[in-house]
Regions:
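Short beta-strand scaffold positions
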Residues: 50-51, 122, 141-142
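Phosphate-handling substructures
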Residues: 64-123
């Protein structure tokens, strides 16, 4: 099976602001462009799962107009990491001690009192386990953190020990990568 990991278009938020579970809209033109580019690439009848955050819903709706053959389903497990009290704050306004603690305990530190990276890994692994053994091509419209977690799952890694193991790259906004499973 092929798993398409698609990142939403560029969000309408000032650079340097922490947003994960914060429900920020994406640029409408960039979303439409991403949908047009993606529509011609996806196989017929693919299953499409998408995050309920509006930046992904926007892309799902634009893509569904172009590709009504896609079987679309919202899946809350595909949301970005919840940074709790950090959400909506400037990264440089978050206490240095908290950021250092996250780096030191990367897998288990609850950012802003909410999720930790291992929570995200576990949540994404549940979706992975449910769909990745099936033959139907599957598309996830999601976020960079979920895509990074998926990259680790594709390598057979369900837990990480420290920040050095977390993938540094993800597709650019409105772009995608495909994993063969």
């Amino acid at each position: 099976m092929t798993l398409w990991l698609v990142r939403h278009a560029q969000p309408l938020i000032e650079a340097g602001i922490c947003y994960g579970a914060l429900d920020v809209a994406a640029d409408a033109l960039a979303t439409q462009t991403a949908a047009q580019n993606l529509a011609s690439e996806l196989p017929l009848g693919a299953r499409l799962l998408y995050s309920p955050l509006q930046r992904c819903v926007q892309l799902q709706r634009a893509l569904q107009v172009l590709r009504p053959d896609l079987a679309c389903q919202m899946d809350a497990r595909l949301v970005e990491m919840n940074f709790g009290s950090w959400e909506g704050q400037r990264w440089d306004a978050i206490a240095r001690a908290e950021l250092d603690a996250w780096t030191q305990e990367f897998a288990t530190w609850r950012c802003g009192g909410a999720e930790c990276v291992q929570d995200v890994m576990t949540r994404v692994a549940a979706v992975w386990d449910e769909y990745c053994g099936q033959q139907q091509p599957t598309v996830w419209l999601t976020h960079a953190g979920v895509i990074r977690a998926s990259t680790l799952l594709a390598q057979g890694k369900r837990h990480i020990a420290d920040a050095s193991q977390w993938p540094q790259t993800a597709p650019a906004w409105g772009r995608w990568s495909a994993l063969q499973n």
